Amino acid sequence: MSFPQLGYPQYLTAGQGAVYGGERPGVLAAAAAAAAAAGRPTGAELGSCPTAAVTSVLGMYASPYSSPNYSAFLPYTTDLTLFSQMGSQYELKDNPGVHPATFAAHTTPGYYPYGQFQYGDPGRPKNATRESTSTLKAWLNEHRKNPYPTKGEKIMLAIITKMTLTQVSTWFANARRRLKKENKVTWGAMGKEDDNIFGSDNEGDHEKNEDDEEIDLESIDIDKIDDNDGEQSNEEEDEKLDHFRHGEKVSLKKESEVMIPSSDGLKPKDSLSLGKECSDTSNTRIVSPGGQGNIQAPPHSKPKIWSLAETATSPDGALKSSPPPSQANHTSPQMQHPAFLPSHGLYTCQIGKFHNWTNGAFLTQSSLINMRSLLGVNPHHAAHHNHHHLQAHQQSTLLATNLGSLSSDRTPERTSPKHSDRENLPRTESPPQLKPSFQAVREKTFSQQEGTSRILTALPSA
């Protein structure tokens, strides 16, 4: 072997047969060819060089080197099939027999969907295939009228189809949606009630998801967690709203019970509709001017709403009528002052009757009651007063006929400003046989001097 790159070709060419013993002829032939190409003398030309010179130069490398035994390894001269087949060991399905029996190839952990579960995880449910859904379809065909399985039936179907309970419920929801779209089949409330009676786990799910898109059975387990969180929050809000509404109903019921007294519980609705206004005036007692005791006010049959327009347009004679002043001495001491009456009306003065209002010093307590305006007065109270005025006027006419001969009693009667109002009243309120005598006596006894004194007494007060 020659090493021209090292610069020692002449020392290795001499005695090559002796050095290497002719064990590797291929190597020697290659060395001779390299020396001829380089233009250097071969071993035959340098035969005169002794072997001692080579030994002295090489030193420890002059001893022959015996090649070890490489029989355990693959020979270099043969073609190695390992390198040509390195890329095919990953194509297990196409070339299953590329490796020899003695070659141990690394096997990758391959899992095939031939078993019960996929990917070797027993916790992962099986996908919805035709074999698994055929059982669900058979059940659905048998229960077309009520396609809502109970919880027990869903558990049974889940065991048979090796699916989860959520997947079975979702499959039935999708199937009902498809039936509605294809055949436009609608199921009544009976099916839903039966489903709720037996405790189905998707109560409210079919009503909520019937019109939505179909749900993927693969991701239903993950989506169910999010839906449960949303449903719990919605249920809490609904419970708070129902509790608030229930509290409002209870408070309204208590208020209505407080407003209606217990004594009015047996009355009809039309009497209860009057409310608190009727309860204030239903027990009002009116004292007669003759002092004959208290008279219970008759109940008003029909309520009437008083308004400002009605009060302004009503005639004065219908609103007030006064008894004669001669009844001042016979009034009962139980008559209260007008300010202490139950209905707090407004005391107003009509402009057309201003001179009557200014002559208030000549009025009695009963006439002051008649001067009150009906503005703001309870309708029952006003009706009772009108009835009282009618009775008092009839009694006053009877008493006036008995005392008609006494001019002293008639003189203060003429000085009262309310006497002129009584003259304007219609004559139908008093008995017809008493009017001519009362009118005749009054006209005969009235003189010019008394009229003059009446006018003079009215002027200073005006």
From Swiss-Prot:
Residues 191-302, 314-339, 405-462 are annotated as: Disordered. GO terms for cellular component: nucleus. It holds the Pfam family Homeobox_KN. Residues 240-257, 410-426 have a biased composition (Basic and acidic residues). Keywords: Activator, Developmental protein, Differentiation, DNA-binding, Homeobox, Neurogenesis, Nucleus, Repressor, Transcription, Transcription regulation. The keyword DNA-binding applies. The keyword Translocase does not apply. SUPFAM superfamilies: Homeodomain-like. Residues 210-220, 228-239 have a biased composition (Acidic residues). Residues 446-455 have a biased composition (Polar residues). One of its GO terms (biological process) is negative regulation of BMP signaling pathway. InterPro entries: HD (IPR001356), Homeobox_CS (IPR017970), Homeodomain-like_sf (IPR009057), Iroquois_homeo (IPR003893), KN_HD (IPR008422). It is found in: Nucleus. GO terms for molecular function: DNA-binding transcription factor activity, RNA polymerase II-specific; RNA polymerase II cis-regulatory region sequence-specific DNA binding; transcription cis-regulatory region binding. Residues 121-183 bind DNA. Its main location: nucleus. Acts partially redundantly with other irx members in neural patterning. Required for formation of the posterior forebrain, midbrain, hindbrain, and to a lesser extent, spinal cord. Acts early in neural plate development to induce expression of some but not all proneural genes, and specify a neural precursor state. Also up-regulates repressors that prevent neuronal differentiation. Patterns the neuroectoderm in both the anterior/posterior and dorsal/ventral axes. Belongs to the TALE/IRO homeobox family. This is Iroquois-class homeodomain protein irx-1-B. The gene is irx1-b.
